[in-house]
Amino acid sequence: FMMVDDFWGEAEWHDFYGAIKQVFPDREPVELPYEHPIFHCVYDLPNKPQIPSLGAAQAGRSRGITWERSDAQEVHYKGIFDDKGRMMVMVCHNTDLGDGWEREGQDPWYFKEFSEKLAYPLGINIVFYAMTH
C-alpha cells in the first residue's frame, strides 16, 4: 500500500500522473466518493477534508481559505486498485495530511482545527482500511 500526499494544483497533478503511469500503465486513479469506507470506517468524517499546510492555514485563516494556490481549491482523494478491487495506492491531491500529523506543536489553533479534527482521524481511517482490505 502506498499513500501519496501534499501535491497541489494542475502542474503537480500532471507530474504525478506521468510518473504513476510508468509504474501502473494499465491502471487509472479513480476518485473516491465521500461514501467510500475510507472516510467512515473508524471515524465518520463530515466531508472529504482539505488539510492545508501550516503556512497556508495561517495565511488564509481570516478568510477560511484552506488551499495553497488558486488551481488547488478542490481536494481530491483517489485510489488505484488491483484486479480484485483492493486499493494499492491512495492519492491525496490538493491537501497536506502530513502537515496535520507533524505540526501539532507549532500552532495550537492549527492543531485543534486541522490535526485533531481532520488529519489524525483520516490517517487512522487510511491505516485501518489498508490493513483490513
Where is each model-derived feature located?
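Mature catalytic domains of secreted/periplasmic carbohydrate-active enzymes
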Residues: 1-133
